[in-house]
UniProtKB/Swiss-Prot annotation:
Protein name in UniProt: Peptide chain release factor 1
Gene from which this protein is expressed: prfA
Function comment: Peptide chain release factor 1 directs the termination of translation in response to the peptide chain termination codons UAG and UAA.
GO cellular component entries: cytoplasm
Keywords: Cytoplasm, Methylation, Protein biosynthesis
Alphabetical list of SMART domains matching this protein: PCRF
Family assignment from sequence similarity: Belongs to the prokaryotic/mitochondrial release factor family.
PROSITE patterns: RF_PROK_I
Modification after translation, per record: Methylated by PrmC. Methylation increases the termination efficiency of RF1.
Molecular function, one GO term: translation release factor activity, codon specific
Cellular compartment(s): Cytoplasm
N5-methylglutamine PTM sites in chain numbering: 235
Amino acid sequence: MNNSILNKLKSLRNRYQEIEIMLTQKNVISNRENLKTLSKEYLKLSEIIKYFIEWEKLEVDIENVNILLNDVEIQGMAEEELYFFNKKKKALEKKINQLLLPEDPNDKHSCFIEIRSATGGDESSIFAGELFRMYLRYAESYSWKVEIMNTSESEKGGFKEIIAKITGRGACGRLKFESGGHRVQRVPETESQGRIHTSTCTVAVMPVTPKTEKEEINSSDLKIDTFRSSGAGGQHVNTTDSAIRITHIPTGNVVECQDERSQHKNKAKALSILSARVYAAKLEKDRQESSSMRKILLGTGERSDRNRTYNFPQNRITDHRINLSIYKLDEVLQGKLDLLIDPIIQEYQADMLSSLSKSES
């Protein structure tokens, strides 16, 4: 463990001991709000301090065993013990490092996921549909609920655009790395020469903000239009003006919802998506101050962000952000997305830990 992290832990232990004393004082106990705040901080610190105390004890044990290595009679036993202690120490340091990382308050929330076809025409729309089904299966593996908010279907199948709300604890934290450009390489069914075509889709992931954090949107900043909902190819599926188009005038953001028969429900859905977009834009502005690696990993949902290539002939999927290729494309499309998300999270946490070390040094 480097000195900067060690100093950080010692500082946290001092704070922990300080709060421990404060929680016995009458003036603190009598102030309900202050007591609640301090108790919450104490509880949060208690876990990391518990591991730190265990780590310090291990350091002493390792030091003692190293002395025993000089004794020929018990050298073999000492080496076994040293191996066990070092393995335990490594696991403890990993746990401590994870606990030291600052929490993203949005990670525990639900999210909206917006998939749009980009370049490649019908093939891009078909791929957008496949991406949605991949996320649907992934959500099912975590028992998250998926609600389709709005769709714009393509004549040849798939979607020009699909927006879904994924409800479940931790959905945003795991899916936030999906924002950006997704490229598919394969031979389309309509290709008679057997040539591989390249198409792209964009994905944007936005946290579903709780009521207390919802971005306030002035009604004067909104332009609301109603129109008749229609299916693929422009066929009318509703004879009333139940579809809603809301334009956020300051940003030019436009949201359409037409999947519900009720105009009121479509409006509620559109406003919730718009609120998430405005909030996500605010987060993106704040994120510009973060390290370049974190900006690359998180993406912005723009097509210029090249996240992955899905190569069907090779059954290969490549994540360009961390230079990772795996030959399990079929499994990933069936929802085994953690094969890619876990390595991304590890890279992200490593970058955050590196930044933490620099700030403490």
